[in-house]
């Protein structure tokens, strides 16, 4: 099948104008997932190095500095992928005729980012936020992501 042209990539990811069918949305969304998956994997491998206790370790630990430098670059990549996903999904929402395509396209990312933030925050404030309070964020993210996957990846669009 080969790589898409730069014009096709620009159409899919750089603006929310236009329409795409479900097959194009599925392929492009899987491409975004394949692009960010290695970044997530490296982030998970470096996560233990972000725990830094000055009572037990020196002020500067090279692996901790590397882990935080990576997290900064990962945040940049994650935002670019999120913007690309919103633009791609807005095109698909427009194709199936749902109102407010940008708002609906942003909803799954909001739910996933809130769930990730809850997972990050909970261990740091465990005395005031029990572990069970993270689960509603997870449930909301799964429900919204499942609904979005169905609507954009499998629901029929307008006939061409």
Regions found by a protein language model. Name each.
Residues 35, 104-105, 133:
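Hydrophobic alpha-helical transmembrane segments of integral membrane proteins
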